[in-house]
C-alpha cells in the first residue's frame, strides 16, 4: 500500500481536476503534512500506552475509509476525493511506527531480533514491486484503490488475529508453575537460545 500510494498519489490527485502536473504535485503536500502529524501522534500514543495492535487497526480503518471513498464516490466530487486522499496517506503512513515497533518489541534476543527485523523489512520492500503495478487504470484508478483497500483490510484482520494470539499466549505463560517454566527453558535450549519464548517474557499487544 505504502509504495503504491507514494508512487501514484500525484496521478490520483491530477485525475481529480484540470490541474497541471506541477499543481498536482503541490496538492500532494497537505496530505503528507497531515500524515507527518499523525505519524508523530500515533508513535507517541503507542509508546505512552505501550500498545501497538489497536493503533494499527485505527490507522487501517482510516485508510480503508479513504480507499472506499475513492472507489465509490464519483470523480466529479473533487473535495470528497481530495479528503479521501488525505485519509489514505494519513492511515498508510501513520501505521508504520507502530508496525515497526511491534515486531521489534516481540522478538527477544539480539540475533532473533536482528534476523526478524531484516526479514520483515525486506519482505515489506517487495511491496514496491507490486505497488507500481496495481495502479494501471487511470484516471479513476478504481482497480488499484480496490486492491489497496483489500490489502488494508487483510492487514487489519491479520493484526487482530495476531493480537488475540499473543494475548492468549501471555495469559498461558502467566499461569505456568515454576516446574513448567523450567521445562519450557529446557525445551528451547536454555537462557542463551530461548529469547522471546522465555516463560517470563510478555508479548507487547
Language-model features: locations:
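Cytoplasmic membrane-interface "Motif A"-like loop-to-helix N-cap segments
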Residues: 47-61, 111
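C-terminal ends and interior cores of transmembrane alpha-helices
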Residues: 58-76
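Intracellular terminal tails of multi-pass secondary transporters
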Residues: 141-205
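Helix-loop junctions at membrane interfaces in 12-TM secondary transporters
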Residues: 71-85, 95, 165-166
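Small-residue-rich packing faces within the transmembrane alpha-helices of Major Facilitator Superfamily
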Residues: 36, 64-65, 125, 129, ...
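Intracellular juxtamembrane helix-capping segments at the cytosolic ends
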Residues: 92-109
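A late C-terminal transmembrane helix in Major Facilitator Superfamily
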Residues: 107-141, 145-151
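Extracytoplasmic gate region of multi-pass secondary transporters
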Residues: 1-46, 53-54, 96-101, 127-132
